[in-house]
Amino acid sequence: MASNPPQPQGPALTAHILNTMSGIPAAGVQVALFKLNESPTPSQQFIATTETNANGRVTSWNVDLSTVESGIYTFRFETGAYFDSLGVTSFYPYVEMAVRINKGQHYHIPLLLAPYGYTTYRGS
């Protein structure tokens, strides 16, 4: 009996941005991912980039992230450019958040965004 090959699990890191000012998904937000290197001196290594789709979701990256290594990663969401494109003044030029990633797990980062504030949490 032949076994079925494993199915791709998709990216290990996804996100979803909702514009809480308008109540709609934040489409077209540029997102970058960096890995923190802690020794000998702290620095960040660029890993990947993407853009939120029409539903405000990050579902793919410009590189394969299905097997990211454990470590501390930083998401950088270019929120200022997003609000500029809407003609809305905002306080934050970008939102950056550091998260601890364990290899083999999926991480979903929801971002509830407004011009003068934001909320985030680990989603499922």
UniProtKB/Swiss-Prot annotation:
Keyword Nucleus: no
Enzyme Commission number: 3.5.2.17
Catalytic activity: 5-hydroxyisourate + H2O = 5-hydroxy-2-oxo-4-ureido-2,5-dihydro-1H-imidazole-5-carboxylate + H(+)
Keywords associated with the record: Hydrolase, Purine metabolism
Gene Ontology biological process: purine nucleobase metabolic process
SMART domains hit by this protein: TR_THY
GO cellular component, one term: cytosol
Annotated substrate binding sites: 16, 57, 121
Gene Ontology molecular-function annotations: hydroxyisourate hydrolase activity
Domain of life: Eukaryota
Entry keyword annotation includes Zinc: no
UniProt-listed InterPro entries: Hydroxyisourate_hydrolase, Thyroxine_BS, Transthyretin/HIU_hydrolase, Transthyretin/HIU_hydrolase_d, Transthyretin/HIU_hydrolase_sf, Transthyretin_CS
CDD domains: TLP_HIUase
Pfam families in the record: Transthyretin
Note: HIU hydrolysis also occurs spontaneously, but more slowly.
PANTHER family: 5-HYDROXYISOURATE HYDROLASE, URICASE AND TRANSTHYRETIN-RELATED
Subunit text: Homotetramer.
Function in brief: Catalyzes the hydrolysis of 5-hydroxyisourate (HIU) to 2-oxo-4-hydroxy-4-carboxy-5-ureidoimidazoline (OHCU).
Family the UniProt entry places it in: Belongs to the transthyretin family. 5-hydroxyisourate hydrolase subfamily.
Stated name of the protein: Probable 5-hydroxyisourate hydrolase
Taxonomic source organism: Schizosaccharomyces pombe (strain 972 / ATCC 24843)
